[in-house]
Amino acid sequence: MTVQTAQIVKNYIGGEWVESISTKMEAVYNPATGEVIAQVPLSTKGDVEQAVLAANEAFKSWSKTAVPKRARILFKYQQLLVDNWEELAKLITIENGKSYNEAYGEVLRGIECVEFAAGAPTLMMGKQLPDIATGIESGMYRYPIGVIGGITPFNFPMMVPCWMFPLAIACGNTFVLKPSERTPLLAARLAELAEEAGLPKGVLNIVNGAHDVVNGLLEHKLVKAISFVGSQPVAEYVYKKGTENLKRVQALAGAKNHSIVLNDANLELATKQIISAAFGSAGERCMAASVVTVEEEIADQLVERLVEEANKIVIGNGLDEDVFLGPVIRDNHKERTIGYIDSGVEQGATLVRDGREDTAVKGAGYFVGPTIFDHVTKEMKIWQDEIFAPVLSIVRVKSLDEAIEIANESRFANGACIYTDSGASVRQFRETIESGMLGVNVGVPAPMAFFPFSGWKDSFYGDLHANGTDGVEFYTRKKMLTSRWEK
């Protein structure tokens, strides 16, 4: 199958590309043009059953495959991703809409995740103590847990799947992936390259669809763990239903990330970082900067700088040269975003840059221009809700204490940033902010794959985060062996 020209996306089960049991289809759009580029099946629980059984059968041999051999397959896979990065970046742009440069960055992050997974055997090593008592020793050994289900979002169609299945299979598990029905083509290409790298049949499976596939994974007794990334309501649902069915669950949810700008901040740096963090990927990322709390003395300067830089942003098809801001994913999301902009005006915020008025918004595709509100308060919907779009809210505060207090009132707690040259302020921020990933003079403090992606509050449901040693813990279980050896 050549996914770029596929009219109907197929499922990948047991190493074969197969049609879904379901005859129901959903269109896959290029969000920059509104054109239909493929049809994706809305698969059934019957499709899930086939994939899980294939994964379970493959687990019998894959879990016994020597760890170095698993790693060598992943190293080859990593090289294939490098060799095909241009194709992958273009495919991301076509089905997701983000700029080609941002898509290239996503490909690199995905490759980094695979590199980490290829080295995971080092982290899988157990521990031993030779003398817990006279003549008695104990040791801990790690083992895979079985079939893993992964449910991934549209906004990072390569990076998030590469968070999940490479590390899971490196640890000896097998995997059933449900990619977003809005961006299924990239996932299919990832499977093709995994097969080319030598991954055995059934180790990685893909079932396309929506609610039925999610519920099928959550309910199936052979699925031992679920990794999820998506919106807060669905994350909470996945966590509750998955744990009710006695599965391990990590569910990464929504965000409302605050950036704090203090009087001593380098405003040129802060402006550059905030613009990129707020409007990159059309604001459709869980680490986007969506609220800026700024001390009153410099607020006018910062707002002026932000508007000036936002006016320079090139909006359009991500494949076009110099484009920074692409479309949001669908027309209904565009209308939802415009509804939030309307509500901000109605609730009394000052609209200093209106993304509804950009030329691209009035043409084909699902575009919303960079939008900036000033004088936002925490009673407003644009402060409270995750908009997931290029909309930035500015809150004026009197002090760092007030900025932290406001940020901590949000129910979301993925990331937070501070712009300052004060070590004392950084320390106070680090110790008192209620958020899992922090940045100092950095707009998007997303960690590398060898660290956990550690959201708090309603930004995460579970105990073990994605990536890093948390990821290895999540995808393995332990055996303790205690032995007595007497002369």
Curated annotation (Swiss-Prot):
Keyword NADP (UniProt): no
UniProt-annotated binding residues for NAD(+): F154, K178, E181, R182, S231, E386
Keywords, comma-separated and alphabetical: NAD, Oxidoreductase
Source organism superkingdom: Bacteria
Biological pathway: Polyol metabolism; myo-inositol degradation into acetyl-CoA; acetyl-CoA from myo-inositol: step 7/7
E.C. no: 1.2.1.27
One term of GO molecular function: methylmalonate-semialdehyde dehydrogenase (acylating, NAD) activity
SUPFAM superfamilies: ALDH-like
Entry annotation: catalytic residues: C286
Family matches, as Pfam families: Aldedh (PF00171)
Reactions listed under catalytic activity: 3-oxopropanoate + NAD(+) + CoA + H2O = hydrogencarbonate + acetyl-CoA + NADH + H(+); 2-methyl-3-oxopropanoate + NAD(+) + CoA + H2O = propanoyl-CoA + hydrogencarbonate + NADH + H(+)
PROSITE patterns associated with the record: ALDEHYDE_DEHYDR_CYS (PS00070)
GO biological process, one term: inositol catabolic process
Transmembrane segments: none
Function, as annotated: Catalyzes the oxidation of malonate semialdehyde (MSA) and methylmalonate semialdehyde (MMSA) into acetyl-CoA and propanoyl-CoA, respectively. Is involved in a myo-inositol catabolic pathway. Bicarbonate, and not CO2, is the end-product of the enzymatic reaction.
Record-given protein name: Malonate-semialdehyde dehydrogenase 2
Organism for this UniProt entry: Bacillus thuringiensis (strain Al Hakam)
Upper lineage: Bacteria, Bacillati, Bacillota, Bacilli, Bacillales
